[in-house]
Structure formats: structure tokens, C-alpha cells
UniProtKB/Swiss-Prot annotation:
GO biological process: one-carbon metabolic process; tetrahydrobiopterin biosynthetic process; tetrahydrofolate biosynthetic process
Subunit structure and binding partners: Toroid-shaped homodecamer, composed of two pentamers of five dimers.
Organism: Salmonella choleraesuis (strain SC-B67)
Keywords (A to Z) from UniProt: GTP-binding, Hydrolase, Metal-binding, Nucleotide-binding, One-carbon metabolism, Zinc
Gene3D superfamilies reported for this sequence: 1.10.286.10, 3.30.1130.10
UniProt-annotated binding residues for Zn(2+): C111, H114, C182
Domain of life: Bacteria
GO MF annotations in UniProt: GTP binding; GTP cyclohydrolase I activity; zinc ion binding
Pathway listed: Cofactor biosynthesis; 7,8-dihydroneopterin triphosphate biosynthesis; 7,8-dihydroneopterin triphosphate from GTP: step 1/1
Name of the protein in question: GTP cyclohydrolase 1
Reactions catalysed: GTP + H2O = 7,8-dihydroneopterin 3'-triphosphate + formate + H(+)
Family: Belongs to the GTP cyclohydrolase I family.
């Protein structure tokens, strides 16, 4: 992976080693983003025409290009590690050894089975070792991996593994609660169900007290 930050390369290698990387083909380095958008727009035009839509209508004529731009620059931007957020780690001079929790992180992802929306929130906690991470970086990491075709179980484990790798500690926990529009808007059309996934590492898995403290934070209990 050329021209990646040290953190992005480290994270990618950790996910590959654990079998948690999103299924990806070898990168097509010869294609820049503008070429990708042009090709996607062309294929989207064909799909819309096969649906018998009239692309000469002023409401539809730019839709293939809008979709292509949205895919490459927005909802699937996390497929490109060049977009991995800049990470700020601070030496733990304060010797913080209690749980740090970031709750209700908004995430919007895309179901890789049907390419429809996953809409949810994540709660992430860790117990610092040698470093602490800028709090907004946790949100950005969640959003980066959400900006891919995903399954929720993998997304949860990816966030856990990435933070363990960057922070140099296994003491990380992640919980995601999300509504899947492949369930809500099609198939069974269940508009009220939600899916919760949790991934625990280190003390969050081995210590009942630490685990319960995290789960209380997830449930917003004092």
C-alpha cells in the first residue's frame, strides 16, 4: 500500500493478520478517483436504463454522477486507507488507569449484502496504558470503518482491533446498536428491531466488574 501513513499501514496489517479486513481485491493503482467515478457513473446509467428510467429527465440525468461521487468520496471512502484519519496519541503522563468511554458515536454504514443503510450508534471504551488518544480520533476511526460495505459484527471487531493496535493495550471494548434497512425496508420489513454487537478485549473480557462498568455505560445507567 503506497503512500499510507504509518498508522494506516499498521492498522491494515493488524486486520489482515486477524482475518478481519473487509474483502478487498488488490488495489487498482492505475485508476484514480475521477476515473473510478466516471466508470461507476457509466455502469449506474446502464442499471437505471434497465429499470426503464428516463435519464433525459432533468431530475434523473445527473443521478449516475451523483451516485458515483457519493460512493467514492463519501459512503465508501473508508475503502481507501489514504483517507484513514490522522491519529494523535499523547503520552499518559497523568497515569490514567481508569476506563475512558466515548458514548453514542453516530455511525451510518452500508449493508454489504444489499447495499442499503445501517444506521446506529457506537460506544467505545479503553483503559489507557502508555498512551491516550484524542477523543475525536475515536469517532473518526468509527466513521472511517463505517464508510464501507459492512456487516455489523466485523465492524465492531475492526474498531476493537484498530484501537488495541494503536493504543498498545488489549483493554478495549466496543458496542454497536444499529437499525438495518435490509430488515426495515425490504424482506421482513420489521421497522422496530435493532441489532446489538459487542466486542471485548483484555480486562473488559476477563474482569466481571470492568465488563459490567462498560455495559452500564452502554445502557446509560449511572
Amino acid at each position: 500500500m503506497p503512500s499510507l501513513s504509518k498508522e494506516a499501514a499498521l492498522v491494515h496489517d493488524a486486520l489482515v493478520a486477524r482475518g478481519l479486513e473487509t474483502p478487498l481485491r488488490p488495489p487498482m493503482d492505475e485508476l484514480d478517483n475521477e476515473t473510478r467515478k466516471s466508470l461507476i457513473a457509466g455502469h449506474m446509467t446502464e442499471i437505471m436504463q434497465l429499470l426503464n428510467l428516463d435519464l433525459s429527465d432533468d431530475s434523473l440525468m445527473e443521478t449516475p454522477h451523483r451516485i458515483a461521487k457519493m460512493y467514492v468520496d463519501e459512503i465508501f471512502a473508508g475503502l481507501d486507507y489514504a483517507n484513514f484519519p490522522k491519529i494523535t496519541l499523547i503520552e499518559n503522563k497523568m497515569k490514567v488507569d481508569e476506563m475512558v468511554t466515548v458514548r453514542d458515536i453516530t455511525l451510518t454504514s452500508t449493508c454489504e449484502h444489499h447495499f442499503v443503510t445501517i444506521d446506529g450508534k457506537a460506544t467505545v471504551a479503553y483503559i489507557p496504558k502508555d498512551s491516550v488518544i484524542g477523543l475525536s480520533k475515536i469517532n473518526r476511526i468509527v466513521q472511517f470503518f463505517a464508510q464501507r460495505p459492512q456487516v455489523q459484527e466485523r465492524l465492531t471487531q475492526q474498531i476493537l482491533t484498530v484501537l488495541q493496535t494503536l493504543l498498545g493495550t488489549n483493554n478495549v471494548a466496543v458496542s454497536i446498536d444499529a437499525v438495518h434497512y435490509c430488515v426495515k425496508a425490504r424482506g421482513i420489513r420489521d421497522a422496530t428491531s435493532a441489532t446489538t454487537t459487542t466486542s471485548l478485549g483484555g480486562l473488559f473480557k476477563s474482569s466481571q466488574n470492568t465488563r459490567q462498568e462498560f455495559l452500564r455505560a452502554v445502557r446509560h445507567h449511572p
